[in-house]
């Protein structure tokens, strides 16, 4: 094969000019036309018996194009191997204006290469290691949340209070005129749960079933409904029903409802503690991992290949559309999401992928079979039948990709924590879990 010069363009972009001998193009085209001749069914001729000259007239141009495309791909692969080029993404091929050699046809291949990844001094990086604990107080708090999730509402004949569920009819008007979304019949909500604007809820508090009143509500300037933002509305509200909240007692029935067959409350609390501890551990590990990944991005000067960033952005866009479809938005698959809105996230992911690959290779951080099994077991632990989940993962090798990736990330986190300056940060239960009430 003739020597080929690799021209450096901007950043990671490279260019090579591929030369395809016309003799090879013509020979391959003739071969393809003969194959077409054997399959061709043309009026006036028996199948496969049409003259080759006629086949060439009918299919010659498309056959030659196919051959050139095939040869270009093959020649580019050969050049990449010979020149030890680490090609990122797919090349684009362009015609060359100066076809000065009558013996060959020239095509330019423009492509990107993977950047050289050099891991900087990790000891100079600061990493935040997040910690949190789960004790009796956190179990009590979680049990209270579980009680609230099982709230029952019972009809009462009294004025409405915060915490009650009310059913109302309402009609709102701005400057005496009704507006879109401003009216409803038998609308149910819980007072004090911030489901409605504060002035609206305050107007309902103290009302009894059967009463009606007008309530003035000022919509905030940043209200999500742009047509009413910053405006004042008068709502005519009729209260139809008041129901008082009743929380279940923490007893055997409550424990059974949470899956404790014998209703033992102590066992229930242990199960709650185990589940909450697992979730807290997952969340603090995620925060620590995020800090480690940020440190790696600081430690490595890296320009991610544009082709890979674009591919990842497209993947993220498709993922978002699929999520919309899964949520019931049937036409979401046709949404035209601009890729620019995903570029920053895509660039981060591609960069981290390159850095982690280098780090794992240099420091032998590939996970062991036992580590992957541990990740799968952790996944399965929260399900009713853990063994069924484990069997599902191991029934198809491709399903182990996610657990393997998590095991790799865990090894990377441990490695970086062993090298960097680690600052421990203890978080409260509420800080880890977010506001839950």
Swiss-Prot record:
Gene Ontology MF, one: protein folding chaperone
Keyword Transmembrane included in the entry's annotation: no
Keywords, ordered alphabetically: Cell cycle, Cell division, Chaperone, Cytoplasm, Isomerase, Rotamase
EC number: 5.2.1.8
Gene3D superfamilies: 3.10.50.40, Trigger factor ribosome-binding domain, Trigger factor, C-terminal domain
Domain of life assignment: Bacteria
One Pfam short name: Trigger_N
Main EC class the enzyme belongs to: isomerase
Catalytic reaction list: [protein]-peptidylproline (omega=180) = [protein]-peptidylproline (omega=0)
Biological process, per Gene Ontology: 'de novo' cotranslational protein folding; cell division; chaperone-mediated protein folding; protein transport; protein unfolding
PPIase FKBP-type domain segment(s): 163-248
Secreted as UniProt keyword: no
GO terms under cellular component: cytoplasm
Subcellular localization: Cytoplasm
Function recorded in the entry: Involved in protein export. Acts as a chaperone by maintaining the newly synthesized protein in an open conformation. Functions as a peptidyl-prolyl cis-trans isomerase.
Domain notes: Consists of 3 domains; the N-terminus binds the ribosome, the middle domain has PPIase activity, while the C-terminus has intrinsic chaperone activity on its own.
HAMAP family with a match to the protein in the record: Trigger_factor_Tig
Family membership: Belongs to the FKBP-type PPIase family. Tig subfamily.
Protein name as catalogued: Trigger factor
Organism: Neisseria meningitidis serogroup A / serotype 4A (strain DSM 15465 / Z2491)
């Amino acid at each position: 094969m003739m020597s080929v010069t690799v021209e450096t363009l901007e950043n990671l972009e490279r260019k090579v000019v591929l030369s395809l001998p016309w003799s090879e193009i013509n020979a391959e085209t003739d071969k393809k036309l003969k194959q077409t001749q054997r399959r061709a069914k043309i009026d006036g001729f028996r199948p496969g018996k049409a003259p080759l000259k006629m086949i060439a007239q009918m299919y010659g141009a498309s056959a030659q194009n196919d051959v050139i495309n095939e040869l270009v791909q093959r020649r580019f692969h050969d050049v990449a191997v010979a020149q030890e080029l680490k090609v990122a993404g797919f090349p684009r091929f362009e015609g060359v204006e100066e076809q000065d050699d009558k013996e060959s046809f020239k095509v330019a291949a423009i492509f990107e290469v993977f950047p050289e990844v050099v891991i900087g001094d990790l000891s100079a990086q600061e990493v935040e290691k997040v910690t949190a604990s789960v004790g009796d107080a956190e179990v009590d708090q979680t049990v209270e949340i579980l009680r609230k999730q099982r709230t029952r509402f019972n009809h009462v004949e009294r004025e409405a209070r915060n915490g009650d569920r009310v059913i109302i009819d309402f009609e709102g008007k701005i400057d005496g005129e009704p507006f879109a979304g401003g009216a409803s019949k038998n609308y149910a909500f819980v007072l004090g749960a911030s489901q409605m604007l504060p002035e609206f809820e305050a107007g309902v508090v103290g009302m009894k079933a059967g009463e009606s009143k007008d309530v003035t509500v000022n919509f905030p300037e940043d209200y999500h409904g742009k047509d009413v933002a910053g405006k004042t509305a008068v709502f005519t509200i009729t209260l139809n029903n008041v129901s008082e909240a009743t929380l279940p007692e923490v007893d055997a029935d409550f424990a059974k409802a949470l899956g404790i067959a014998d209703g033992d409350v102590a066992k229930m609390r242990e199960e709650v503690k185990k589940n909450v501890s697992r979730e807290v551990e997952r969340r603090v590990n995620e925060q620590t991992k995020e800090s480690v990944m940020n440190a790696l991005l600081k430690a490595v000067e890296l320009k991610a290949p544009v082709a890979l960033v674009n591919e990842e952005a497209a993947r993220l866009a498709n993922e978002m559309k699929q999520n919309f479809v899964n949520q019931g938005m049937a036409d979401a698959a046709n949404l035209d999401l601009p890729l620019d809105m995903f570029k920053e996230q895509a660039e981060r992911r591609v960069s981290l992928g390159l850095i982690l690959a280098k780090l794992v290779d240099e420091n032998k951080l590939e996970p062991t079979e036992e580590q992957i099994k541990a990740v799968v077991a952790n996944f399965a632990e929260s399900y009713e039948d853990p063994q069924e989940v484990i069997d599902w993962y191991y029934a198809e090798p491709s399903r182990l990709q996610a657990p393997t990736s998590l095991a790799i990330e865990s090894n990377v986190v441990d490695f970086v924590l062993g090298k960097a300056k680690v600052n421990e940060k203890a978080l409260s239960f509420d800080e880890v879990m977010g506001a839950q009430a």
